[in-house]
Amino acid sequence: MSKVTFKITLTSDPRLPYKVLSVPESTPFTAVLKFAAEEFKVPAATGAIITNDGIGINPAQTAGNVFLKHGSELRIIPRDRVGGGHQPRM
């Protein structure tokens, strides 16, 4: 079985630490997200993986599909940082 390798960078840390993960192509991407979140001590339930261009990745696919669509360099961010806008005051 072939493997795919991802370089996942933690964007919420100014030092931009990264992890390199190699997983079988058929691995559910939710498992990759969960493992990367645990490695960076970010809660998996509140983390999101995006491309270097800022495009969010739907984790409901295989690691092989993500690799083919988005390449190997990805970023993990806490979801409280997703969006870019601020909440208007009421």
Curated annotation (Swiss-Prot):
Crosslinked residue numbers (Glycyl lysine isopeptide (Lys-Gly) (interchain with G-Cter in UFM1)): K69
Predominant cellular place of this UniProt entry's protein: nucleus
Post-translational modification, as annotated: UFM1 precursor is cleaved by UFSP1, promoting its maturation: processing of the C-terminal Ser-Cys dipeptide is required to expose its C-terminal conserved Gly residue.
GO cellular component, one term: cytoplasm
Covalent link (Glycyl lysine isopeptide (Gly-Lys) (interchain with K-? in acceptor proteins)) residue numbers: G83
Domain of life (superkingdom): Eukaryota
Keywords: Cytoplasm, Isopeptide bond, Nucleus, Ubl conjugation, Ubl conjugation pathway
Cited Gene3D superfamilies: Phosphatidylinositol 3-kinase Catalytic Subunit, Chain A, domain 1
One Gene Ontology biological process: reticulophagy
UniProt propeptide residues: 84-90
Annotated localization: Nucleus; Cytoplasm
Complexes and interactors: Interacts with uba5. Interacts with ufc1.
UniProt record similarity statement: Belongs to the UFM1 family.
Job of this protein: Ubiquitin-like modifier which can be covalently attached via an isopeptide bond to lysine residues of substrate proteins as a monomer or a lysine-linked polymer. The so-called ufmylation, requires the ufm1-activating E1 enzyme uba5, the ufm1-conjugating E2 enzyme ufc1, and the ufm1-ligase E3 enzyme ufl1. Ufmylation is involved in various processes, such as ribosome recycling, response to DNA damage, transcription or reticulophagy (also called ER-phagy) induced in response to endoplasmic reticulum stress.
Name of the molecule in the record: Ubiquitin-fold modifier 1
Highest classification ranks of the organism: Eukaryota, Metazoa, Chordata, Craniata, Vertebrata
Originating gene: ufm1
